[in-house]
Design a protein with these regions (language model features):
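N-terminal Rossmann NAD(P)H-binding glycine-rich loop of SDR-like oxidoreductase domains
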Residues: 6-26
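NAD(P)H-binding glycine-rich loop region in Rossmannoid oxidoreductase-like domains
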Residues: 47-88, 96
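Substrate-positioning beta->alpha
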Residues: 143, 171-177, 191-213, 221-225
Length: 337
């Protein structure tokens, strides 16, 4: 990728920012597109959205490759907004990228595009199914992935990667939510907590995405799931996150039907009273927390020529170290006041 310029959309997010930083560290010039400054030193920020034609076209001008992560990622919200950002924004970005002469395009998707509510055990990257996907995010990401793969052509190669449950130090989503809710005694385990779940440590997710970009002559027109390949019981994983942060792990179990019913009620309440916060439970979340999600990674490893370098155990060591360092730094700050 030396000498090429790469656009990363959604670089103010956890994964997008890490992708942009990794490219810059490798000597690749990076431009970003998102609503607010990316915070990535050395990146050229274009402030805007994929739904705005002016900022979108400015972002792709003179670009060789695109890594598209920008999306509306919430459990609830206006279906029209999900469609505008995730589907129509992707459609327009693909068209503008092709018109600007972009030759490689990586669409960062999600395994939820092929999740129909039942356990996934050892499957590969099944085709995205918008009509069967669960929730507006999954439905619109599935539709967007189909658009992206349909745009694959000799002039612009397109591939899709689906990192699953990305986590690590500084993660504002999975780890932060688990730890925050556990610290308040609001993190019950749905079902037995024994459902096996694959995850992807942040550095491994970044490496996998960049491998898909490097190997796009092989990966174009196809979708790939990215995970550590080390499924763990979800209760064990959540407990490990909590212990790393010095928080008591969850011990209360809630039956799946109860969690689903609570989720259905919460969805109605949040539609009536929309706000910036997320509901404590949704039907989609209840399914995600009670069903297995682990994947066959053999095709991913072969086609991307990639293996996760960190994995779960080393990732947890790094998470513990990061929390320990943050605690020491906070204590030093208190003493200095």
């Amino acid at each position: 990728m030396t000498g090429e310029r790469v656009l990363v959309t959604g670089a103010s997010g956890y994964l997008g920012g890490a992708v942009a930083a990794a490219l810059l560290a490798a000597g690749v010039p990076v431009r970003t597109l998102q609503r607010r400054p990316s915070g990535v030193p050395g990146a050229e920020d274009v402030l805007g959205t994929v739904t705005d034609p002016a900022s979108r076209r400015a972002a792709v001008e003179g670009i060789d490759a695109v890594v598209h992560l920008a999306a509306k990622v919430t459990f609830t919200g206006d279906p029209a907004e999900f469609a505008a950002v995730n589907v129509e924004g992707t459609r327009a970005l693909l068209a503008d990228a092709a018109a600007a002469g972009v030759t490689r395009f990586v669409f960062v998707s999600s395994p939820s595009v092929a999740h129909t509510g039942t356990s996934i055990m050892g499957d590969g990257a099944a085709p995205a199914e918008p009509s069967r996907a669960r929730g507006e995010y999954a439905r619109t990401k599935a539709a967007a992935e189909l658009l992206a793969l349909a745009a694959d052509s000799p002039s612009m190669a397109v591939t899709a990667v689906r990192p699953h449950l990305v986590w690590g130090p500084g993660d504002p989503q999975l780890v932060a939510r688990v730890v925050d809710r556990a610290s308040k005694g609001r993190l019950p385990l749905v079902g037995t907590g024994a459902a096996l779940v694959d995850t992807c440590y942040i550095d491994d997710a970044v490496d996998g995405i960049l491998a898909a970009l490097r190997r796009i002559d092989v990966t174009h027109g196809q979708a790939y799931v990215l995970t550590s390949g080390e499924p763990r019981p979800i209760g064990e994983l959540f407990s490990a996150f909590c212990r790393a942060a010095g928080v008591r792990p969850p011990a209360v179990h809630v039956p799946v039907p109860v969690a689903s019913a609570v989720g259905a009620i919460a969805e109605v309440v949040w539609r009536i009273r929309p706000g910036d916060d997320e509901p404590p439970m949704t039907r989609f979340l209840a399914e995600q927390l009670s069903t297995a999600h682990w994947f066959d990674q053999r095709r991913t490893h072969e086609d991307l020529d990639w293996r996760p370098a960190v994995g779960v155990s080393r990732g947890l060591e790094r998470l513990r170290a990061a929390h320990r360092d943050a605690t020491v730094a906070a204590g030093a700050g208190d003493l200095a006041e």
